[in-house]
Amino acid sequence: PKTKDAEATFVKAMNERVKKLGCTGTLFENPHGLDFDEWAGDMHSTAHDVALMMQEAMKNDTIREVVASEDSWIEVTGADGTDHSHSMDTHNYLLGQDGNIGGKTGTTDDAGYCFTSAYNRDGDEIYTVVLNSTTTDQRFTDTATLANWYYGHKMTVAIANTQEKTANDNPLMARISQTDWTDKTIDATLADPTAQATVFSLAGEVTEKVSYDDLSGTVHVGDKVGSVTLKQDDTKIAVMDLVAD
């Protein structure tokens, strides 16, 4: 829609968008992020909010491609109609190192040296944010430290948290009743008895919940009889079928 003040309309949309992302400590006052001279004001954000924005941005394939580029050339047409080629080089000195797949730097006197980036190691993607670093090198050092700290606290746990075994020597997850049998139960194991889940060791206790299907009639080995769900602090980290064994 047409507007008399396109910039104000755009900034309003920016603030509305980040609120929908769950950002509670962010205020945009211009579209470019400068905060000095004629742009001085109350613009602000938090590391948490910037991480939410980075996470959302990385859902866009074009943005993922751009931040993963070391350098590129773009063609622009000036106001006089003349075409120009411009070289664009990345300021992300961590790109391609230890799983870093992209990032965005930013610097002002008030904000200091800032950097948000994305890492992906073995399919586990995270987003880091460093604000108000003292030097450009320090923001990258701090970023690498954050990423290594997180991945250093990842661990794998067995979904089958039991020492009991079925007759077939698989983990005994449950004994499930069958409505047609009053004196028998069905041994249940995991669809993949060796399955593991990856958790963050500092994120809280891992709990397990087993759900049972209503069973009747003939039940064969390998038939689904329920499911098991692993959670860590109410965050679902794994779900797997239980099968008759």
Q: Where do the protein language model's features map onto the residues?
A:
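Domain-terminus/edge residues, biased toward the C-terminal soluble/receptor-binding domains
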Residues: C23, G41-D245
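Mid-domain, small-residue-enriched loop/turn segments at the edges of structured enzyme/sensor domains
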Residues: P1-Q55
